Amino acid sequence: EGAELIINTYPHEIQESMREMHPTCMCSVPRFWEKVYIAVKAKMDDAGSVQKKLFYHALAVGKKRNIEYIANCMRPPLALELEYRIINKTVLSMVRKQLGLEKPNIFPTAGAYVSPEVEEFVHAIGINMVVGYGLTESLATVSCDHSDKKRSLGSVGRPISCIQVKIGEDNEVLLKGPTITPGYYHRDTTNAKAFDKDGFFHTGDAGYLKDGELFLTERIKDLFKTSNGKYIAPQQVESLLLVDKFIDQVAVIADQRKFVSALVVPEFRL
């Protein structure tokens, strides 16, 4: 029957649009889900003790069922499954309804580091977040979560079948395959640096492979080196700070300094 395509050109109104349009699929960046997590958590923390206790119990049940079992391709114990169904129809469905996500199907997210804390929350409330990784030079998708295979928090999924991934020097992720660019147009000098001797493309991202899943740690060029020689990965620090409701934007500063600091833009709309 096809699908209805909805385009929102006002980022600050996205949550209002969701409650109005009730999307079943939506592509987004991790920052969107960080905002959702912050808003829901703040509302529940301000609720009465009984409501708060019920909410966090529901989250614990959702986490155990959806992450410890479903994400690992394991069947939940009968008692857990029955408890989840009750919790899902009562507490978790109310949370999703407040978000406008009564019938969540698939919600791809990519473009930045996804905090495991946020990813855990999204799966716990019953939303199928599919984390992926891609580049302009890779015709978008390099890897993504597969519903029929184990999914680990913090990973960017498994490489798609036509892509070869290897880890090079400085733990750089290197790619090769039919969807990877053959080179930049009329940029011979750049192309000589962009590919290794075996034809693998240098992504500039650091990471590692574990049990078939790809994990990213940092953009190599973004790594800071403090004055005492220690390397700092700013994105991981920033993702931890961005789950605070009082912070809108943050930039970690550490290069050639004795300490790590951060430039913070407060959330003035509270």
What are these regions (language model features)?
Residues T24-C27, A39-R151, Q164, D248:
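Gly/Ser/Thr-rich phosphate-binding loop
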Residues A206, D244-F268:
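C-terminal boundary motif of the adenylate-forming
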Residues E4-M21, C27, D46-V50, I232-V237:
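ATP-dependent adenylate-forming carboxylate-activation enzymes
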Residues E1-I6, G126-N128:
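A short helix-loop-beta submotif of the ANL/AMP-binding
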Residues M26, V165, G212-E213, L241, ...:
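Residue-level signal for inorganic ion chemistry
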Residues P159-T226:
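Conserved ATP-binding/catalytic segment of the ANL
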